[in-house]
Curated annotation (Swiss-Prot):
This is Small ribosomal subunit protein mL103 (rPPR7). It comes from Arabidopsis thaliana (Mouse-ear cress). Component of the mitochondrial ribosome small subunit. It is found in: Mitochondrion. It comes from the Eukaryota. One of its GO terms (molecular function) is mRNA binding. Its main location: mitochondrion. Residues 21-37 have a biased composition (Polar residues). NCBIfam families: PPR (TIGR00756). Keywords: Mitochondrion, Repeat, Ribonucleoprotein, Ribosomal protein, Transit peptide. GO terms for cellular component: mitochondrion; plasma membrane; ribonucleoprotein complex; ribosome. Residues 21-43 are annotated as: Disordered.
Length: 412
């Protein structure tokens, strides 16, 4: 409760600054928006995230970075179901003089979508006349994105048809069509997405590589390999700019075939002048893991740096899971420590297997150390499952009690 009061004070002070026509920090600890963006990527505590965002010295210095920082802050709050704080934060921006600028206004619609608060996003879109903000495909796309992020996949086509009829200045562009295509793919109907793509082609509109790749991914996931391969060939014929995302979708499918096929595609990427990334190598590592070839998988992991890549959360999650599956818990714990150093700690379900395995193998100190580390890295609202696991395994003690506030967690 105390942390929530602190958050509301920060938000209200930020709102006052916006009303005064400034976006300066409410406290003396000013930071640049770029620094805030970088720090927020590593910060999971919603109160700390809110404080970082509120202390940005000038949100107008980099609008793109500012939008990203705002969306990260909203996601941290949403993870803890702090919807009231999210509403207060986003509504505070409606006092900003830039509210009449459509790109600025659209960030508010998008942010509500990041929190799956679609009704708020819709209301904000409908309020644009009230604030004297013009509408175009920019705000329309923000609304479609908010709907998509809120997982209202069936509503996206409805909005796509209805909104341009209500507001004649809104003309869907290739981004609008791309969002519509993604909504069909996310709902498991790539065949409808292909129909939309054909409509675009009939109108002479560019079908972006992103749209092609989205359909390709959905087809591979449904096991429609022949249709997917035909679409890939069409992309090549039409001269689409094949990028990492497009190749990684093919690699995702190839991992089910064999590690050798994945390696072939990685080599093909390189021959096309593309640089395989962490996602590419994660699929290769997964292909080895799923076939019990852990030594080969570890070589891929250890070779990431040499390939100018850094492990991400999926890298650590995959490797730790399969090491635990093979009962190699000490190796899993070593990988966990690296994930902490990289600020890429895997999810609870992955680490639960590791903790249980460490305890079963009489590595209780390591198990307690892992849980102690997690306590320091995440806010108390994230830790209920960990507390329950501690008690079940007999690891819980009063001296290791979970912090009752974010402040205590930071001091732990």
């Amino acid at each position: 409760m105390a942390s929530s009061r602190i958050s509301l004070r920060l938000v209200r002070r930020f709102a006052s600054a916006a009303a005064d026509g400034t976006t300066t920090a409410p406290s003396s600890g000013k930071i640049s928006v770029s620094k805030a963006k970088s720090t927020l990527r590593k910060e999971h505590d919603p109160d700390k995230a809110l404080k970082i965002y509120a202390n940005v010295s000038d949100h107008s210095a980099s609008p793109v970075s500012s939008r990203y920082a705002q969306e990260l802050t909203v996601r941290r709050l949403a993870k803890c179901r702090r919807f009231s704080d999210i509403e207060t934060l986003i509504e505070s921006h409606k006092n900003d003089p830039k509210i009449k600028e459509e790109p600025f206004y659209s960030t508010l619609i998008r942010s509500y979508g990041q929190a799956s608060m679609f009704n708020h996003a819709m209301r904000t879109f409908e309020q644009m006349d009230q604030y004297g903000t013009p509408r175009s495909a920019v705000s329309f796309n923000a609304l479609l994105n908010a709907c998509l992020h809120s997982k209202n996949f069936d509503k996206v086509p409805q909005l796509f048809d209805e909104i341009p009829q209500r507001y004649n200045k809104i003309i869907p562009d290739k981004i609008s069509y791309g969002i519509l295509i993604k909504s069909y793919c996310d709902s498991g109907t790539p065949e409808k997405a292909i129909e939309i793509m054909r409509q675009m082609q009939g109108k002479g509109m560019e079908v972006t590589t992103i749209a092609f790749t989205t359909i390709l991914s959905s087809l591979y996931k449904k096991g429609e390999l022949e249709v997917a391969d035909n679409l890939w060939n069409e992309m090549v014929k039409k001269g689409c700019e094949l990028d990492n995302a497009a190749y990684n979708v093919r690699i995702m499918s190839a991992q089910k075939e064999s590690p050798e096929r994945v390696k072939e595609l990685i080599e093909e990427m390189s021959s096309m002048g593309l640089k395989p990334d962490t996602i590419s190598y994660n699929y290769l590592m997964t292909a080895y893991c799923e076939r019990g070839m852990l030594d080969e998988a570890k070589k891929v992991y250890e070779g990431l740096e040499g390939n100018n890549c850094a492990p991400n959360a999926a890298t650590f999650r995959t490797l730790i899971f399969h090491l635990c599956y093979s009962r190699l818990y000490e190796q899993g714990y070593a990988i966990f420590k690296k994930s902490v150093y990289m600020h890429k700690i895997p999810d609870f379900n992955t680490l639960k297997h590791l903790v249980v395995g460490l305890v079963e193998n009489k590595k209780r100190d390591d198990a307690k150390g892992l849980i102690r580390t997690v306590k320091k890295k995440f806010p108390p609202s994230f830790l209920n499952a960990w507390k329950k696991l501690e008690e079940e395994l007999g690891l819980y003690s009063k001296t290791d009690a979970f912090p009752s506030s974010a402040k205590e967690a930071a001091a732990a």
